């Protein structure tokens, strides 16, 4: 594999939070220092006026090909500057090992995963998973987290009214899931769309590093009150270390919640796509860079947008020293973007929209030192 030199770009390093004009050199699968460039031919790529970052991490996406709600990892990652993806709990104990065989080990994208507490996971879009704790298989969960520790990173639970309510349960699935996570020593990612219990009660159960998923959902009990202010218990949860993922999806984001929250400075800790076939390269998601552009146009500083797709997800994966930096000796997962001036409308699933004037446009993706995506006009 020949040496690649990205010249004249503006490099952002999330670990140091610095933007710096400099060159980045890659040899083999690693980033190398400029004075370590081996003699011989090198491929020099001019990235003037481009932003160079560590590869993005899509912290919530559905990738298991054995269900009807998944997308292909490499198709949805590399063209968007993404080098690491985390499956959002598509599988439970009954089908996770098949996911490893059919998708995780067969993709160039680095794939991590949540484990759904429901044994069959999200097997079908025709009916919802059964979240009754009576059917949780703790022994199998324990075995999977031991055997697949390099892949499994969290437990996943959905507590929406339309999922939990038909069972006659309320807070029991959440309480039991947290209890299991304590034993497994892992975070819990909780899907909070219209939760069966009030959102302020639900966040009281969450621990530092647990993730409140779909933070800008707009119906039922949400993170903002009728005056458009972020609720006190939500603010307290963030202070004690609970993380908030925007996790857009088809119907999991509404401007009527996001705009007042962001005006209050309540930005997402994590920005993810929640990709499924319904949102594959179409509105309201289109791509992770499109969502990043939306938040930038809503007033979120660029550095914070980048941290929400690199640094915070990498911390959750306990890989920040490898995936959230471009220092010499680390894995050569790199993304290159241009920020272009372009009038663009961003939509939610209700067709509400805002107008923006800048877009983050992918130019190149490098995974483990290999160029896996490149715009035709990038010299």
Residue ranges and their predicted role:
Residues 9, 331-379:
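C-terminal cap of metal-dependent C-N hydrolases
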Residues 9, 24, 29, 49, ...:
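Divalent metal-coordination and catalytic microenvironments
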Residues 257-339:
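His/Asp/Glu-enriched, well-ordered alpha-helical/loop segment
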Residues 57-61, 85-87, 111-115, 153-157, ...:
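Hydrophobic faces of well-ordered beta-strands that scaffold small-molecule active sites
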Residues 53, 102-114, 180-184, 237:
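Alpha-helix-loop-beta-strand connector modules within alpha/beta enzyme cores
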Residues 75-160:
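Divalent-metal coordination cores built from histidine and acidic residues
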Residues 160-261, 265-282:
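Active-site core of metal-dependent hydrolases
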């Amino acid at each position: 594999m020949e040496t690649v030199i990205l010249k004249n770009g503006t490099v952002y390093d999330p670990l140091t939070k610095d933007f710096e004009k400099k060159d980045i050199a890659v040899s083999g699968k690693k980033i190398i220092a400029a004075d370590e460039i081996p003699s011989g031919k090198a491929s020099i790529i001019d990235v003037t006026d481009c932003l160079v970052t560590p590869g993005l991490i899509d912290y919530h996406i559905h990738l298991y090909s054995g269900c009807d709600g998944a997308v292909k990892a490499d198709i949805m990652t590399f063209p968007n500057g993404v080098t690491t993806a985390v499956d959002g709990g598509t599988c439970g104990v009954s089908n996770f090992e098949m996911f490893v065989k059919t998708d995780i080990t067969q993709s160039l994208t680095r794939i991590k995963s949540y484990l759904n507490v429901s044994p069959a996971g999200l097997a079908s879009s025709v009916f919802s998973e059964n979240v009754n704790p009576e059917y949780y298989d703790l022994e199998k969960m324990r075995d999977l987290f031991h055997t697949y520790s390099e892949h499994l990173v969290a437990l996943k639970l959905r507590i929406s009214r339309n999922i939990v309510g038909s069972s006659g349960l309320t807070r029991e699935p959440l309480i039991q899931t947290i209890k299991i996570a304590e034993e497994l020593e892992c975070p819990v990612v909780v899907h909070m769309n219209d939760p069966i219990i009030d959102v302020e009660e639900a966040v009281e159960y969450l621990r530092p590093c647990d993730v409140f998923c779909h933070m800008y959902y707009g119906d039922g009990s949400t993170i903002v009150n009728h005056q458009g202010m972020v609720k006190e218990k939500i603010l307290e949860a963030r202070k004690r270390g609970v993380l908030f993922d925007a996790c857009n999806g088809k119907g999991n984001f509404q401007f009527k919640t996001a705009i007042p929250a962001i005006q209050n400075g309540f930005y997402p800790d994590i920005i993810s796509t929640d990709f499924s076939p319904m949102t594959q390269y179409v509105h309201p998601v289109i791509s992770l860079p499109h969502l990043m552009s939306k938040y930038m146009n809503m007033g979120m500083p660029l550095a914070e947008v980048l941290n929400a797709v690199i640094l915070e997800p990498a911390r959750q994966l306990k890989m920040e020293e490898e995936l959230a930096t471009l220092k010499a000796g680390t894995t050569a997962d790199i993304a290159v973007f241009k920020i272009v001036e372009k009038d663009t409308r961003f939509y939610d699933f209700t067709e509400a929209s805002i107008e923006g004037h800048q877009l983050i446009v992918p130019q190149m993706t490098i995974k483990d030192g290999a160029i896996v995506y490149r715009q035709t006009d990038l010299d």
